Amino acid sequence: MPDTQIEAGNESPFFTRSIVESDREVAHAIHEEINRQQNQIELIASENIVSRAVLEAQGSPLTNKYAEGYPGRRYYGGCEYVDVVETLAIERAKALFGAQYANVQPNSGSQANQGVFLALLKPGDTILGMSLDAGGHLTHGARPNMSGKWFKAESYGVRESDARIDYDAVRAKAIEVKPQLIIAGGSAYPREIDFAEFRKIADEVGAYLMVDMAHVAGLVAGGVYPNPMPHAHVCTTTTHKTLRGPRGGMILSNDPDLGKKFNSAIFPGLQGGPLMHVIAGKAVAFGEALQPEFKDYVTRVVANCQALSKAITDGGYAIVSGGTDSHLALVDLRPKGLKGNSAEQALERAFITCNKNGVPFDPEKPTVTSGLRVGSPAATTRGFGVAEFTLVGELMVRVLDALVDQPDGDAEVEAEVREQVKALTARFPIYPELA
């Protein structure tokens, strides 16, 4: 029998080269993005800054592992450790929201919503969600979205007098159109939602109630916003935004039978192998959200957004609905004659990042808009308090006032504000070891 010689393995640079060594172009772009996040004030309400631990989990070798199926029921071998990670994510999610069921595999909030639709509806069924211009989301029945193409999408809005949901109008609409599914929640509604009232309406017309709490999930987990779980048949959410985890989605329910349908809808219905490195990041973020300091964080998120709103109001600008109960606020620029797109650009030149956004009954196109959406999660994560958010509001007013006077923007004012922003952000560094 011949001797089998096994040569010593070569130490491959494939496993040792850094991204700077192997791909300078991508490394440079990442470096510049880190600098942008450090030097600019992030006010986009759907963005946040994750912990170093979440970054490490998401950049781990779990990205190598295929794991179609669910813990204990995989279609591949070698899943014992990713099973541990996914089970941790599931159990922590259930504990955070008081849920009996959780699916942490959706790759996004949109796919979580699609999973619910696939489980509960058939093409042509009627859904009732908040209209996009009133603060809803694309996936709640907007015409360009799958939800507006595959289903008969009806919508409810807000009162013109105070920009709040009119529950009597929602009830009347539900009775009129008889939806199979009612969707509560949105992407630009700053006030608390009465989930108990939505459930009453759903029961009256025999509809399922789905709550999309993508924007407020962290506030719910921290106890500063009403929990929809006791009222909804199903809740969907993203895992970033106020929950401060990696970008991804999740489905929650207290109905185990519906849970089986949601599992089948996500896999094999919509997705194949889950992103295990992202699920690891979710597990870490959920663990962070279970700590006592997370409640303090979300309490500050709300207080900071209210301080920002007050500073903007004191500067002569209108806040939709007169204020906020959450992490976001909408600035109505119509009284000043400004458009959302030009305001967004002027503020970004001053290193304040937010987004143009439609306001209720907005006459402008979605690419133009009459408003700005601002939010407090990211800057609160880096340590800003009420004093800093008040200053940020004052700086915003200064840039916007200059834009009223000079429609192309005032370069001198923007430069002065930019230097003030850089001085402020320098006091609150992020990822210093990555800079």
UniProtKB/Swiss-Prot annotation:
(6S)-5,6,7,8-tetrahydrofolate binds at L132, G136, H137, L138. Pathway: One-carbon metabolism; tetrahydrofolate interconversion; Amino-acid biosynthesis; glycine biosynthesis; glycine from L-serine: step 1/1. GO terms for molecular function: glycine hydroxymethyltransferase activity; pyridoxal phosphate binding. It catalyses: (6R)-5,10-methylene-5,6,7,8-tetrahydrofolate + glycine + H2O = (6S)-5,6,7,8-tetrahydrofolate + L-serine. The record marks H240 as: Plays an important role in substrate specificity. It holds the Pfam family SHMT. One of its GO terms (biological process) is tetrahydrofolate interconversion. Its main location: cytoplasm. Its EC number is 2.1.2.1. Keywords: Amino-acid biosynthesis, Cytoplasm, One-carbon metabolism, Pyridoxal phosphate, Transferase. Its cofactor is pyridoxal 5'-phosphate. GO terms for cellular component: cytosol. It is found in: Cytoplasm. The modification N6-(pyridoxal phosphate)lysine is found at K241. It comes from the Bacteria. Homodimer. Catalyzes the reversible interconversion of serine and glycine with tetrahydrofolate (THF) serving as the one-carbon carrier. This reaction serves as the major source of one-carbon groups required for the biosynthesis of purines, thymidylate, methionine, and other important biomolecules. Also exhibits THF-independent aldolase activity toward beta-hydroxyamino acids, producing glycine and aldehydes, via a retro-aldol mechanism. Belongs to the SHMT family. This is Serine hydroxymethyltransferase. It comes from Maricaulis maris (strain MCS10).
